[in-house]
Curated annotation (Swiss-Prot):
Role played: Catalyzes the addition and repair of the essential 3'-terminal CCA sequence in tRNAs without using a nucleic acid template. Adds these three nucleotides in the order of C, C, and A to the tRNA nucleotide-73, using CTP and ATP as substrates and producing inorganic pyrophosphate. tRNA 3'-terminal CCA addition is required both for tRNA processing and repair. Also involved in tRNA surveillance by mediating tandem CCA addition to generate a CCACCA at the 3' terminus of unstable tRNAs. While stable tRNAs receive only 3'-terminal CCA, unstable tRNAs are marked with CCACCA and rapidly degraded.
Residues the entry annotates as binding Mg(2+): D21, D23
Reaction catalysis annotation: a tRNA precursor + 2 CTP + ATP = a tRNA with a 3' CCA end + 3 diphosphate; a tRNA with a 3' CCA end + 2 CTP + ATP = a tRNA with a 3' CCACCA end + 3 diphosphate
Cofactor note: Magnesium is required for nucleotidyltransferase activity. Nickel for phosphatase activity.
Lineage of origin: Bacteria, Pseudomonadati, Pseudomonadota, Gammaproteobacteria, Enterobacterales
Note: A single active site specifically recognizes both ATP and CTP and is responsible for their addition.
Listed InterPro entries: CCA_bact, HD/PDEase_dom, HD_domain, NT_sf, PolA_pol_head_dom, PolyA_RNA-bd, tRNA_CCA-adding_enzyme
Family label: Belongs to the tRNA nucleotidyltransferase/poly(A) polymerase family. Bacterial CCA-adding enzyme type 1 subfamily.
Residues bound to ATP: G8, R11, R91, R137, R140
EC numbers on record: 2.7.7.72, 3.1.3.-, 3.1.4.-
Protein name: Multifunctional CCA protein
Residue stretches making up the HD domain: 228-329
Gene behind this protein: cca
Positions that bind CTP: G8, R11, R91, R137, R140
Length: 413
């Protein structure tokens, strides 16, 4: 029995990055030998075991053979005669087909170290094309390592295009698509994930609402980048710089979906695109089974982001109604989230990346003022039932009006 550290832990160590999870491959062992050594079996489809002390995963070396459609249609063979090299050959990318033995020696039969140095994401073998999930995984790796200047090898990208054109991605379950997307959205450059999907044709298949934005023009005065799809990826990049929060990034990605519905004869203007996009956000989230909290914020951002941009001319009554509409009294975090997504929208434009966004500050300040109006005083004044809410709203509007007069400059005529 020989044990090797494999995959991401070896890759990230060679890149000088923190190693989070360790996966191990065991060569020359049977399931019974693993159980006798105190390991706990957890794998159903193939033998995977948990170490009795570290609880890290130890998998018996195995090979895989395509036996059906999609990413689950594989027959696995795990036995003591499976070599380390055979196990590494079934992996997706050469940089993931690396192993390290007890002496610290790197086993690299597929030239993963060479591709690490060249900053290349390259598939190990033609078997890559048998698993459609790998299209998304490569896109996610491209996003994860974009700051290190990694790129996808030309032949790998060509294979991803072939897989997409062959309809392989249609076999992916919504849960797997969302899981890969969720992980990509938390990387330093999530926009790269969606750009790669577009480059290989997968964006049109998996995210048609986003793909539809490319080629849709916006007024050059406000959007020097012109293309709404380009703007969407720029705003996502900006959101990633402004916040690590998944919900902020996802809502930013979806903020302009309504522009994909604008009739061509009305281009480049998109009046009412915010509210129009709400149903597309709902459609996308329902299809991919996006968590409800992310969906709800994305719908609010789609509906109200343009309103935030006009904050200096908003009436105090409108501002308080906005807080009602986003349910800020029960979910105060939404004020900050919407401020950040609106800022990402404005700064996610060519030439505006370093712009100040005072509307975000004013939104936060107005919220603090409205929130500070005490409910207790309204109750003590004798108001009852629905009259409490009505009086509280009046006082909040008055407080915001007083603040706005002092702190929020009126736009020049």
């Amino acid at each position: 029995m020989k044990i090797y550290l494999v995959g991401g832990a070896v890759r990230d160590a060679l890149l000088g990055l923190p190693v989070k999870d360790k996966d191990w491959v065991v060569v020359g062992a049977t399931p019974q030998e693993m159980l006798d050594a105190g390991y706990q079996q957890v794998g159903r489809d193939f033998p995977v075991f948990l170490h009795p002390q570290t609880h890290e995963e130890y998998a018996l070396a195995r090979t895989e053979r395509k036996s059906g459609s999609g990413y689950t249609g594989f027959t696995c063979y795990a036995a003591p005669d499976v070599t380390l090299e055979a196990d590494l050959q079934r992996r997706d990318l050469t940089i993931n087909a690396l192993a390290r033995d007890d002496d610290g020696q790197i086993i690299d039969p597929w030239h993963g170290r060479r591709d690490l140095e060249a900053r290349l994401l390259r598939h190990v073998s033609p078997a890559f094309g048998e698993d459609p999930l790998r299209v998304l995984r490569v896109a996610r790796f491209a996003a994860r390592y974009a700051h290190l200047s990694f790129r996808i090898a030309d032949d790998t990208l060509a294979l991803m295009r072939e897989m997409t054109a062959a309809g392989e991605l249609e076999h992916l379950t919504p849960e797997r698509v969302w899981k890969e997307t969720e992980n990509a959205l938390t990387t330093r450059n999530p926009q790269v994930y969606f750009q790669v999907l577009r480059d290989c044709g997968a964006l049109r298949v998996l995210f048609p609402e986003i793909d539809a934005l490319f080629g849709v023009p916006a007024p050059a005065k406000w959007h020097p980048e012109i293309d709404t799809g380009v703007h969407t990826l720029m705003t996502l990049s900006m959101a990633a710089m402004l916040s690590p929060q998944l919900d902020v990034r996802f809502a930013t990605l979806c903020h302009d979906l309504g522009k994909g519905l604008t009739p061509k004869n009305l281009w480049p203007r998109h009046h009412g695109h915010g509210p129009a996009g709400v149903k597309l956000v709902e459609q996308l989230c329902q299809r991919l089974r996006v968590p409800n909290d992310l969906r709800d914020l994305a719908k609010l951002v789609a509906e109200f982001h343009d309103l935030i941009h006009t904050f200096p001319i908003l009436q105090p009554k409108t501002i308080v109604k906005l807080f009602d509409a986003i349910d800020a009294w029960r979910k105060p975090q939404r004020v900050e989230q919407i401020a950040l997504t609106s800022e990402a929208d404005v700064r996610g434009r060519t030439g505006f990346e370093a712009s100040d966004y005072p509307q975000g500050r004013w939104l936060r300040e107005a919220w603090q003022v409205a929130q500070a109006v005490p409910t207790k005083e309204v109750v003590e004044a004798g108001f009852k039932g629905i009259a409490i809410r009505e009086e509280l709203t009046k006082r909040r509007i008055a407080a915001v009006a007083c603040w706005k007069e002092k702190r929020c400059p009126k736009p020049a005529n």
